[in-house]
Amino acid sequence: MRGKCALLYHCCTMRVVYVLLLGEMSGMSFEIGLAQTVHPKDGDVVGMVKRYAEQARMYGVDLLVFPEALMTPFEKTPEEYRAIAEPVGGAFSQAIAEYAKRYGIWILYTMLEEAPEGKQPYNTAVLVDDKGKIQTTYRKTHLFDTDTIQESERITPGENLHIPTATPFGKIGIGICYDLRFPELARNAALEGCDVMIYTAAWLDGPRKADHWKSLLRARAIENEFFVVGLSRCDSGYLGRSLIVNPFGEVIEETGPIMDLVVATIDLEEVAEARAAMPVLDHVRNDLY
């Protein structure tokens, strides 16, 4: 049986949505929290992370996810990006690692990672465990160069796909925003054993943007028969509307364009159930493509 019940919690800083997905819970489930944020007016991003971590711990979250462009707004010059960037493990990373350890939760966040001298920084996702130890990083590989924005003016692209990371709650795959439009990244993660694919994003609002966001997230879940999580920031001009899709392509939680902490129970047995019913990955023709 698949379904849900919801408890809404309102406070002055954020709205918390708690969703329980009904089914057989046998140690294969975990709590995921999506921190749909805006940049704080006072610029205290670390303080904001602390507040979300405190709330997440109250709701028993195992993995707390923050959106793309957490460290600083996108709307800065290339020179400002280079000045803000830090190495992974620098002061920004250390502060978040401390909160992960203090509240006993895993945290996935993004930062501007220093690149070799003369290069623009990387747009990097970092996964830190509940002991404050960095378990994996991923540098965004597909940069958003379009008719209106040239991300490559600010960011250096990564050169490697993310290999799903083993955690106490399954193998976690990571993509960043525009990566969602490239199904090869998700398929590679699936073939590497991914259970939950997380896209952390600053998805722009505008014509067709919401439809593309939802359709692409559902498609990635259906194609690969794993959970897909899409988290977008919700500042002015950005979409918000974060959602979670199960391995059958069903949207099991979706929020609006406001600050939220969405907490959901993900049952990994649904991955095995979907793949047993229709073993798509077993039918991939690697000899042809």
Predicted regions and their residues:
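Cationic, low-complexity basic patches in intrinsically disordered or flexible, solvent-exposed regions
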Residues: C5
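Short, Lys/Arg-enriched N-terminal segments with co-localized hydrophobic residues
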Residues: Y9-G27
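Active-site-proximal beta-strand elements of phosphoester/diester hydrolases
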Residues: S29-K41, V65, T124, T137, ...
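Conserved hydrophobic/aromatic positions in well-ordered beta-strands
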Residues: G33, V126-V128, L243, V262
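A short C-terminal boundary segment appended to hydrolase-like catalytic domains
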Residues: A272-Y289
